[in-house]
Amino acid sequence: MSVYSDQTPNPVAAVVILAAGEGKRMKSSRSKLLHEIAGHSMLSYAVTAATAVQPEHIVVVVGHLRDQVEAHLAEIAPHVLIAVQEDQLGTGDAVQAALGQLADLNGDVIVTLGDVPMLSGETLAALLNEHRTQQAAVTVLTAQVPDPTGYGRILRDADGLVSGIVEHRDADDAQRQISEINSGTYVFDATILRAALTEIAPTNDQSELYLTDVLALVRQAGEPVGALLIDDRWQTEGINDRIQLSRMNTEVNRRILQHWMREGVSVVDPSTTWVHASVDLAPDVVLLPGTSLEGATSVAAGAQIGPDTTLIDVEVGENAVVTRTQGSLSVIGAGANVGPFAYLRPGTTLGAGGKIGTFVEAKNARIGAGAKAPHLSYLGDAVIGAGANIGAGVIFANYDGVRKSTTTVGAYDFVGSNSVLVAPVEIADGAYIAAGSTITGNVGPGELAVSRSRQRNVSGWVARKRTGTKTARAAEAALEQKEPS
């Protein structure tokens, strides 16, 4: 959602997102920017924040593992422009690469980082407003943090105005005591930025072109440099290793859960409950310990999820109960009951009031209202009518080694325990399948299908074949009791 209206005067000329770094400390074959926070890539958060201020252009600067990053951008934001930083020569060089995609650009340019996922569009809008209000040439977003290690420090003069930024590795002992840090997010006047970038030089320990040096040049030229100090330090937190990634995930999840609890959702144990940013929950939902809701999962009012349940892209109806279940790309109807230890694979739809019970696996199965499969069954490529009862141990044999076929069970059918339905087969409404049957042909309405060998009892077999065993002795005792006195 945009933080500006379509009538906002002087729109942002461009937002530049720096996403070219190597991310060595992640020790990953994936680009750092593609690692996820609450179900979304770090880079997607940056693009969302940038989009919120309605810029004329969004430019993402790529470099390390650029093919991965470009492919991801093609999925989530095909409208963005791509600039390539061929060599890792610093943030100043990266911005120069971005401006190469924006010839004759005038107006305000926001520069931000791709690995600061909690930075919001509202904060970018506030930074832009501060920049325009102060009529500054450049405005930097800052925060006070308890441990500034690794961050650039904000230098201020005797009047409290920003005089420059020094990177941590280049700071002296006194400067390292400063707790106000550079977030890496700025608003620049495009003309001033373009000119200043031609003047900065690699005079630091890394022999890189620092974008931060632009502030000192602007200040030396007598142009105003502004700053917006924000209270929420998490909006300036970058991610460079797995520890920081874990910490950020925890903080984002904490905020997501707090949001939903304020909206009427009960979370019994927030420390073990994880909810993605894209999940939708209704009032009076209860999340029990060990619950993980991911992707586009939605849970309607009054439903109870957990404990120990993971749902990915699952729609849960009102007052449903889902216990110790793994599910993905499925629909659970209102008042339905699932679990414990159920497995819902993609394409499963359980109707209102239906039941999928203990150790039942369903895949591409449409299960009607009130139908039940209480335990120990496999329902693969199935169409099950309303009110049908699937007994324990029933297998829908859907695969012949070459192709998968569908089994149809009609409304209010009764399928006896330990039966195998060999697809393709259709069982009409109101039919019975005797326990232990292997069904290979269609069954008509009201028919009983029995497909099993006739039982034969062999008298005396245990005494002859298992002589001396406990079983034989038990049989002998039982026979003696049956003999007339």
Question: Where would I find each of the regions flagged by the language model?
Answer:
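Catalytic-core segments of class I nucleotidyltransferases/pyrophosphorylases
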Residues: 163-254, 258
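Glycine/small-residue-rich pyrophosphate-binding loop that anchors the diphosphate of NDP-sugar donors
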Residues: 182-185, 277, 405, 423
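Extended, small-residue-rich solenoid/repeat segments and analogous flexible loops
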Residues: 220-324, 332-337
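Rossmann-like NAD(P)H-binding beta-loop-alpha module
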Residues: 143-174
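Conserved N-terminal catalytic core of the sugar/cofactor nucleotidyltransferase
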Residues: 2-14, 41-129, 133, 470, ...
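A short, conserved acidic/glycine-rich loop-to-beta-strand motif
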Residues: 134-144
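Glycine-rich hexapeptide-repeat left-handed beta-helix
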Residues: 3, 313-485
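Glycine-rich N-terminal loop/short-helix segment of MobA-like nucleotidyltransferase
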Residues: 13-37, 53, 76
